[in-house]
Amino acid sequence: MSDVIATNQTILVVGGGISGVTAAIEAAECGKQVILVEKNPSLGGRVSQLYKYFPKLCYPSCGMEINLRRIKANRNLRVLTMTEVGNVSGESGNYSVTLKTTPRYVNENCTACGECGQAVEAEFDSEYDYGMKKRKGAYLPFNMAYPQRYVLDPRMIGTDDAEKARGACKYDAIDLDMQESETTITVGAIVWATGWQPFDADKIQ
């Protein structure tokens, strides 16, 4: 996080769902420096979990693929996953924002080969599948996840499974010593796009 450079000309977008991603891309393509933060390990938000979405009844993968290509091609846009806003102070045009990043335990050497996931035995409820399926303790959130980098569940750290994951990685991508980090940046504007909660279908009689 120490290499995050921002000025009062920078736009901070909070939330990596379709609204936040769209806002960040559009601003970056207009020439603005943009930092996009998302609390989860990957971008996409609720839309990435849907089968189809209204009104075109398209599969989310279509629009996501286009937007992810735009993100990768734009040097004005910096993406920080597993990051939340801790504090905001200041005024329009000059905000001071504290960002807190939780450890992924996987660094940028990761190629998403999946060897770590095959090596571990621990399983947990899949957040992406609303708890209806299980996922491994070392996992890629979903096939089109951006960044394409595995995550180690923090409940696995300190166990034999964590060491199995590290031993299985040929790229030295597993870093079990990662710690939570905090940094303070200065930005000129903030877009708050933290998403929505789906209706609890259990309430339907």
Q: Across the structure, where does each feature detected by a protein language model lie?
A:
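N-terminal glycine-rich dinucleotide-binding loop that anchors FAD/FMN and/or NAD(P) in oxidoreductases
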Residues: S48-V85, E127-P147, Q205
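Conserved Rossmann-like nucleotide-cofactor binding loop
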Residues: S19, P41-S42, Q197
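Short hydrophobic core segments
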Residues: V14, V37, T186-G195
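Iron-sulfur cluster-binding cysteine motifs and their immediate structural context
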Residues: A28-S42, G90-S92, S96, T111-L152, ...
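Flavin (primarily FAD) binding-site architecture
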Residues: T194-Q205
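Core beta-strand elements of the Rossmann-like FAD/NAD(P) dinucleotide-binding domain
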Residues: T7-Q9, Y105-N107, S181-A189
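Beta1/beta-strand and adjacent pyrophosphate-binding region of the FAD-binding site
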Residues: D3-S19
